[in-house]
Structure formats: structure tokens, C-alpha cells
């Protein structure tokens, strides 16, 4: 539980109060009353809280010492900039960002999100049974949120069960946009947790697009159906071997997208595999679910189904409401970030983002 404590240096900053949870100090705005810690990661700790002004339950994420690692600081800045613009019921809402006391020396960042009960990773690992309707509804919402992002010119690039938050009503929201990019931005840094990484990323292809997110969705959907990862590779080459074992060896024309000759030779050197039909891996799944999965987990990204077409697949019949799928453009220029920025400039840009959350006079 959250424990109210005195400020560490004995000096109480105006408008702030202090709590400890899981041996972590939270210096937060007085309108937020913490309840209990609900998650921990490399970034820090997340706690549930109540906004005493609105009575709304929220999640507060403390990112500790954010400038210790420049790449992590860039990820945080990217999430701040993106979530200020996106508005969709299947994308997590950033409700507030607490303004630090010291503009030029703050180290910790506190982000306030809408509160969700769990995430898809926890649900998959639980003993809770999942009906075909559950599977379909989770997939529908994921595709729906992704269609919105893609229509706004945004690739998520790190979709996995742990980044899909779920509440007791089975409502699903996509979160963690630290790796998201617009199409135009050249990308060299690490993308997508290995098990959910598309072949074109594993093969170091430079020219990739929305299909990388579709592959990740396919891996997630397979994991929902089978309650375990479909391609749990130990490293990149092993990951490719696991994929070929399932989808089968590829013809030359299916490898045209690989712009690296060495990578193409590696794929062609793998032992022949005729593949395994998904209906054999998931014998109890709805045949229409298997058909859609087959269209998402296609090795050649140019032949992979699009998000829009996946939403129109017969498996989704009865769920799609066209008027509920807005196509909105996020201002691309606002998401462009200089990857070579140093800490002081990142700190200043974060401060400017935080100012957008100050109450209007």
C-alpha cells in the first residue's frame, strides 16, 4: 500500500506530497491520492491513484532518473508528443503529466494514464478460459486501434501482449509508444520484442512499413489462441528458423523484399520445411480465425493482409461499425525528433510538452 512520508530533504515543495511504494518515492501533485503499486518495470513503478478533484481512478507511472539513458529519455519524449495528439478508445489516454518543481534539473517524470485492470500478457498466462468471442473481440479492438494509428501515419513497432491493456469489460487499449514512428522517419534503433518481430526486421531490411505491426498482431492472436508464444526464439537466427518451420520454406519470388543479399542467402540455406498448417497447431480454433491468422503471418510483407482488410475479414463479421473507425491525421511535424539530441535539449522539450497539461486559466 501507499505510505505517506516526509520529503527526503525536509523541504516540502509547493503543491506536492510524498509517498513510498515498493521502496520507491513518489513526489506527486496533491490532488492525486495513491492507493497501491500495480506494476514495475525497467522504467520504474506504476501505482493506482484517485484524482481527488474528479474522483477518477488513474494510473501514475513514475519514470525514474529518465535522463540516465539518452535512448530511454527519447522514448519518453516520443510518447509524450504522440499521446498528446492521438484520441481513440482503443489507444491508452494520457490524462496528465505532472510539472516538476525545477525546470532545468528535474530527473523523474510522472505520467498519469487512465486506469486499466490488467494486460493481455497476464490474461494469456492466467487460467481464465477464453471463448472464441473473447479472442475475436480482443483482436477486433487491437486492429481497430491500429487502423487509427496507421491512418495517422504512425507505426507502433513494439506490439506485444504486455503493451495491450485490458479492463474487466474486456475493453482493450494499445499502450507504450516509446518506439512509435511516422512512416517518413528513418529507423535504425532496436524495434519490436524479438518474439513479435516481423521477418523483414529480423533480416535487417531498411524499407519496412505497416506490415510489421500486422505480423506482431498475428503473433499476438496466435498466442491468444494457443496460450503460449508461437515463435519463442532465443536469438534472431533461431527466431527465423522457428518462423520457417511453421510458415514453410519460401520461393525465390517470396524473398524479393529482402534487400540484403547475405540475409537472402541465409534464408535459402535453411533446411527445407513444408510448414505446419495453423489448424494443426490450433485444432480447436474457429476455422475463420485460422484463415485470418494465415493471412497475417505471411513471410513476404507485400503479401501480408492489411489492417483494413483484416477488419473486413469474415471472422470479424458483426463487429465492424464503419463510423467508429475515424481516420485522423496527427501532425507529422510534431512527432519528428532529432535522434542525436542531448539530455538538456530533451529535458527542455519534455518541459514544453508538460506545459500543455497545465489547467487553462
From Swiss-Prot:
The modification Phosphotyrosine is found at residue 190. Disulfide bonds: none annotated. A motif (TXY) lies at residues 188-190. The active site is at 158 (proton acceptor). GO terms for molecular function: ATP binding; MAP kinase activity; protein serine kinase activity. Activated by threonine and tyrosine phosphorylation. It comes from the Eukaryota. The keyword Chloroplast does not apply. It holds the Pfam family Pkinase. This is Mitogen-activated protein kinase 14. It comes from Arabidopsis thaliana.
Amino acid at each position: 500500500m501507499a505510505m505517506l512520508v516526509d520529503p527526503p530533504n525536509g523541504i516540502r515543495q509547493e503543491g506536492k506530497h510524498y509517498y513510498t511504494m515498493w521502496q520507491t518515492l513518489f513526489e506527486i501533485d496533491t490532488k492525486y491520492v495513491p492507493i497501491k503499486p500495480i506494476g514495475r518495470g525497467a522504467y520504474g513503478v506504476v501505482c493506482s491513484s484517485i484524482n481527488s478533484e474528479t474522483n477518477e481512478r488513474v494510473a501514475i507511472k513514475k519514470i525514474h532518473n529518465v535522463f540516465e539513458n539518452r535512448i530511454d529519455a527519447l522514448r519518453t519524449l516520443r510518447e509524450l508528443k504522440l499521446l498528446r495528439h492521438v484520441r481513440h478508445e482503443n489507444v491508452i489516454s494520457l490524462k496528465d503529466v505532472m510539472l516538476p518543481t525545477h525546470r532545468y534539473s528535474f530527473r523523474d517524470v510522472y505520467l498519469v494514464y487512465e486506469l486499466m485492470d490488467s494486460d493481455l500478457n497476464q490474461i494469456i498466462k492466467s487460467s481464465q478460459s477464453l471463448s472464441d468471442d473473447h479472442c475475436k473481440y480482443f483482436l477486433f479492438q487491437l486492429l481497430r486501434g491500429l487502423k487509427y494509428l496507421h491512418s495517422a501515419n504512425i507505426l507502433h513497432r513494439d506490439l506485444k501482449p504486455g503493451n495491450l491493456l485490458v479492463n474487466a469489460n474486456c475493453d482493450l487499449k494499445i499502450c507504450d509508444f516509446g518506439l512509435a514512428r511516422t512512416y517518413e522517419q528513418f529507423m535504425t534503433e532496436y524495434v519490436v520484442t524479438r518474439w513479435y518481430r516481423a521477418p523483414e526486421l529480423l533480416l535487417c531490411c531498411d524499407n519496412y512499413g505497416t506490415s510489421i505491426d500486422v505480423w506482431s498482431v498475428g503473433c499476438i492472436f496466435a498466442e491468444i489462441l494457443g496460450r503460449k508464444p508461437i515463435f519463442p526464439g532465443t536469438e534472431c537466427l533461431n527466431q527465423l528458423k522457428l518462423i520457417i518451420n511453421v510458415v514453410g520454406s519460401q520461393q525465390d519470388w517470396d524473398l524479393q523484399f529482402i534487400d540484403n543479399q547475405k540475409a537472402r542467402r541465409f534464408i535459402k540455406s535453411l533446411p527445407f520445411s513444408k510448414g505446419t498448417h495453423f489448424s494443426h497447431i490450433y485444432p480447436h480454433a474457429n476455422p475463420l480465425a485460422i484463415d485470418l491468422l494465415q493471412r497475417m503471418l505471411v513471410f513476404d510483407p507485400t503479401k501480408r493482409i492489411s489492417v483494413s482488410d483484416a477488419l473486413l475479414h469474415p471472422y470479424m463479421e458483426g463487429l465492424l461499425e464503419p463510423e467508429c473507425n475515424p481516420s485522423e491525421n496527427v501532425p507529422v511535424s510534431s512527432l519528428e525528433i532529432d535522434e542525436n539530441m542531448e539530455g538538456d535539449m530533451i529535458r527542455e522539450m519534455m518541459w514544453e510538452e508538460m506545459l500543455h497539461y497545465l489547467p487553462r486559466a
